[in-house]
């Protein structure tokens, strides 16, 4: 049992990587402009890959590169040079799924460890051992497994084979992400990173002899969201994950914001550290749960970890829960607490805000004395990207974020 599991955070671009690292990630996973499963993310061009890997390594953080699409023949000619680039850049592992890609990786990037993607649907110890025999250093288990099943896999595989599992984020309604609905309906191939997420759309029924007449599946005029999964959240179950033998806790979300990366990474970092400090007396810090509730998310559940989940779908809508919003992202700060933020959403003088910083509980305060670049103390700050100056009674971290509870429509 590994009492210090790795915390693996998403890095959709260089900014998100920096925030994930600042808030406690042990490792980040990212993709180049090709061959990854999140084509909608900004991702990293070749120069940014080198820069990002160097940035992470300078801070003791590992970088895993996703090369986990299911490629066709036309994709293969570009792969050898790309794999050589990743090895030369210092990638700590390649996340792979297709056996053809694995074969090429072993030939063109032989020094880089292989992590077998969740796309391969590893559901049992024989499958895990197969990949270990093929040279894999780590397997990313299918999301469909229970903790009991993970513990059995851990017990029946070599201790040198690392086990990674998703602990937080969006769930695919299809089997471990292998879905053809998007390609069928929109021409966008989910298995090449371009999923249109039709599972989040609303649907109605049409009876064969009544064309054009649409019937809601439930008594809701919007239709019903038949395929719409809730989001996974295991923040309250750190001990169970550790005891099951999970070596790496993976957060989903390369398409999410830097704020999301900061909040969720920081919450899991604090929970893991609290558990490690005293496993026998561990109680999850309440602010950890509060933090994951303050990012944009769908209704949470625990996936399949505690057995077959009958309540994993949310039929009413596919909207995110957004109770908090970012007010400002950092521009500069100094040792005297003078901090400048770029405005993202409006706020009023006297309004309650929260300052989020790495490794600390949020600092709640009412705005007094904030000024613009001209030194004017406005009643309302509402110009996007305007620079707003605050003075705090303590030095503020360069990766701090300002937020507030969202205004309710009147």
Regions found by a protein language model. Give the residues of each.
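Surface-exposed amphipathic alpha-helical tracts and adjacent flexible/coil segments at the periphery
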Residues: 1-22, 27-30, 34, 52, ...
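Conserved phosphotransfer cores of two-component systems
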Residues: 109
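Aromatic/His-enriched, Gly/Pro-containing loop or helix-boundary segments
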Residues: 117-122, 141
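Glycine-rich, positively charged N-terminal anion/phosphate-binding segment
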Residues: 38-57
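Alpha-helix capping/helix-boundary segments
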Residues: 100-101
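Short beta-strand elements of ligand-binding domains
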Residues: 65-66, 96, 116-118
């Amino acid at each position: 049992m590994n009492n210090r599991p790795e915390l693996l955070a998403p890095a959709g671009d260089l900014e998100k990587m920096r925030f994930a690292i600042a808030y406690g990630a042990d490792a980040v996973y990212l993709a180049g402009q090709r061959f990854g499963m999140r084509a909608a993310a900004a991702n990293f061009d070749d120069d940014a890959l080198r820069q990002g890997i160097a940035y992470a390594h300078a801070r003791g953080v590992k970088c895993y590169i996703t090369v986990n699409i299911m490629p066709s023949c036309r994709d293969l000619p570009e792969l050898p040079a790309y794999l050589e680039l990743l090895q030369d850049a210092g990638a700590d592992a390649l996340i792979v799924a297709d056996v053809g890609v694995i074969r090429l990786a072993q030939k063109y990037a032989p020094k880089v460890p292989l992590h077998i993607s969740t796309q391969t649907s590893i559901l049992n110890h024989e499958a895990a051992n197969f990949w270990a025999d093929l040279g894999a250093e780590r397997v990313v288990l299918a999301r469909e497994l229970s903790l009991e099943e993970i513990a059995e896999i851990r017990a029946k595989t070599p201790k040198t084979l690392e086990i990674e599992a998703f602990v937080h984020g969006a769930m695919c309604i299809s089997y471990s992400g292998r879905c053809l609905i998007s390609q069928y309906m929109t021409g966008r191939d989910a298995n090449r990173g371009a999923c249109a997420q039709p599972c989040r759309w609303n649907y109605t029924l049409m009876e064969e002899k009544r064309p054009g007449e649409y019937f809601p599946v439930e008594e809701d005029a919007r239709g019903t969201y038949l395929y719409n999964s809730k989001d996974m959240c295991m923040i309250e179950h750190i001990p169970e994950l550790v005891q099951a033998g999970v070596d790496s806790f993976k957060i989903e979300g390369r398409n999410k914001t830097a704020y999301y990366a900061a909040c969720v990474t920081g919450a899991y970092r604090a929970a893991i550290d609290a558990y490690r400090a005293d496993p026998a007396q561990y109680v999850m810090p309440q602010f950890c749960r509060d933090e994951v509730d303050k990012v944009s998310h769908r209704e949470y559940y625990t996936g399949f970890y505690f057995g077959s989940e009958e309540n994993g779908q949310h039929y009413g809508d596919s909207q995110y829960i957004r109770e908090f919003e970012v007010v400002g992202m950092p521009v500069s700060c100094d040792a005297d607490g003078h901090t400048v933020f770029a405005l993202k959403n409006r706020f009023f003088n006297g309004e309650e805000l929260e300052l989020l910083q790495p490794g600390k509980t949020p600092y709640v305060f009412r705005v007094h004395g904030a000024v613009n670049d001209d030194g004017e103390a406005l009643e309302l700050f509402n110009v996007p990207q305007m620079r707003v100056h605050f003075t705090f009674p303590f030095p503020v971290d360069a990766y701090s974020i300002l937020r507030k509870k969202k205004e309710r429509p009147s």
